A protein has these predicted regions:
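Short linear capping/connector segments at secondary-structure termini
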Residues: 44-51, 108-110
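Catalytic Zn2+-binding segment of zinc metalloproteases
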Residues: 28-43, 77
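Active-site scaffold of zinc-dependent metalloenzymes
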Residues: 1-21, 34
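Short helix/loop segments within enzyme catalytic domains
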Residues: 53-56, 60-102
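Pan-zinc metallopeptidase signature
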Residues: 97-147
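Active-site recognition of the HExxH zinc-binding catalytic motif
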Residues: 22-35, 66, 70
Length: 147
């Protein structure tokens, strides 16, 4: 629960119980990346890249986990588990932990070349994309022309 508290107090996310679902679903998304072999391919490539190129690759990994969190949210909606405002809570959480938002808050300026998790806009867009699709049909952030 400490990360939940940080999202609210330190990062400015809207308060709500669905934030926990978003965070857990995002982390489960990383597990899906692990069992599908994406994570091992990512780790192999990271060993061959400069820091800048490694950051650019990592920025492709994180929104994919946000996409998967969106797929889970869609399932929850289809099952009737969501309350009004839940999706807005998840979007607020994703926005609040985008690299640009975090950097601006911490240092007053943004350095896109140092991003490791994607911008607020990218993170929320991929969450929404997963929510709208409701399946894995559009989850390939690595081949996407634009994040």
């Amino acid at each position: 629960l400490s990360f939940y508290d940080s999202l609210i107090k330190d990062f400015g996310a809207d308060e709500g119980d669905f934030i926990l679902s978003y965070v857990i679903s995002h982390e489960v998304g990383h597990h899906v990346q692990e069992v599908t072999g994406i994570m091992s391919q990512y780790q192999e490539m990271m060993g061959k890249l400069s820091e800048k190129d490694g950051n650019a690759l990592t920025v492709r990994l994180e929104p994919q986990a946000d996409y998967l969190a969106g797929v889970v949210a869609r399932y929850q909606k289809d099952q009737g588990y969501l309350d009004p405002g839940d999706i807005d809570e998840a979007i607020s959480a994703a926005w609040s932990i985008g690299d640009d938002t975090l950097q601006k808050r911490a240092q007053g300026y943004v350095r896109p070349e140092s991003f490791t998790h994607g911008s607020s806009e990218e993170r929320t867009r991929w969450f929404k994309k997963g929510y709208e699709a409701g399946d894995l049909s559009e989850w390939d952030t690595f081949s996407a022309k634009n994040l």
